[in-house]
Structures are given as C-alpha cells and as structure tokens.
A protein has these predicted regions:
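Short aromatic-glycine-enriched beta-strand elements
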Residues: 31-33, 58
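Short, solvent-exposed beta-edge and connector elements
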Residues: 3-4, 47-49
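Nucleotide/phosphate-binding loop and acidic/charged catalytic motifs
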Residues: 21
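Exposed loop and linker-edge segments at protein-protein interfaces
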Residues: 47, 57-88
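Hydrophobic alpha-helix/coiled-coil detector that fires on Leu/Ile/Phe-packed helical surfaces
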Residues: 1-16, 25, 36-42, 54, ...
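Conserved hydrophobic/aromatic positions in well-ordered beta-strands
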Residues: 33-35, 82
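A residue-level detector for short acidic-glycine micro-motifs
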Residues: 36, 50-52, 62
Length: 92
C-alpha cells in the first residue's frame, strides 16, 4: 500500500567523469586515497579528490588521470614502494 508521489527527474549534463570502484577507495585523517600501480608495477599511494559516490563507484575529481591503474583487490596486502603482479579486474 504505497503512497502516490510525484517525482521530477533532474538529469545533469555531465562531461565524462573518472570513476573507480568504491572498494579501491581508502580514507585516513588526510582524506581519500587509492593505491595506484605505475608502469614498473610499483605501488604508490595517491591522494584523490572524491566528488561523490554512487552505485558502487567513486567519482574522482583530482589525483588520477584516465588510464591509470588502481588496486581494487588485495589493497590491505600492499604498501607504497613494493612491486606487484597486477592483473586486470573483472570488467576493466
């Protein structure tokens, strides 16, 4: 027995945005960060600006460029400076 309501869909005309899975996102007293993997497969902690989080994704406003690799599984097993064997995640 739901109540009848009226809604208005507000569609934003957004440019393409950069997103990462929320599970890649970590937070400490300094703010949000991800663990990125460089071309030599070395891990580096990268501070990121998060504009919003929706549907399991974080919209990144700063700190990453399109095409950069971030760790989405095993984040708790790495630290900056180590070398990893990076494999693509499901869907990306």
């Amino acid at each position: 027995d739901g109540a009848l309501v009226r809604v208005q869909l507000i569609a934003e005309d957004l440019p393409e945005v950069l997103t990462v899975p929320q599970q890649a996102l970590q937070r400490d007293l300094g703010g949000y960060f991800v663990m990125a993997v460089d071309d030599a497969n070395r891990v580096e902690q990268r501070r990121v600006g998060v504009e919003r989080q929706v549907d399991g994704l974080a919209v990144i406003g700063s700190g990453l460029e399109p095409g950069e690799r971030v760790i989405v599984e095993g984040v708790n097993k790495v630290r900056p400076g180590i070398t990893v064997d990076a494999a693509p995640a499901e869907g990306g």
